[in-house]
Amino acid sequence: MTLTATTSHTVGPYYHIGLTWLNRENLANEQTLGERVAITGQVVDGNGDVVNDAMLEVWQANAAGKYDHPEDEQDKPLDPHFEGFGRVPVDAEGRFRFTTIKPGTVEGLKGSTQAPHLVVLVFARGLVKHLLTRIYFEGEPANVADPLLECVPAERRATLLARPDAAGVYQWNVILQGTEGETVFFDY
């Protein structure tokens, strides 16, 4: 039997019909171990216009640096109160906000160490395939040796860094395209 791959489709205006029940803007509960963080931002296109129908899918390790996934074989503890996953829709102004915990460092390839980060998939109208990026935390000492950040040109790394404001809320925006400040997206 020969199987044919299913084609990709844009998210379209109706994703909310089948996906809103999966929306979770608070990835950590009161019992989750780790430092609580809030991340807020906005999704805009290359002209700076609001993208008001985007959705962010967030994946991350727990505070010990372990993913709640069977392929993560690190000898680190799982947190029974943390799944490390959430879907976050934007509002009419393209804004989003979610709360979670700051993840621990994660083992990378060939014994390297990845800095604390969140993996973010961006879904939006007009995208045939979702976009993959990461959120790192500004000022995190482990950033200097992160193997993926080292591959990003120095002048573009800022697009991956969430910056804390005066209240301690991290700010991070998604710019879908353009020559000025486009968010770094990764192939996979």
Name each model-derived stretch:
Residues 1-188:
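Beta-strand-dominated extracellular/periplasmic modules and repeats
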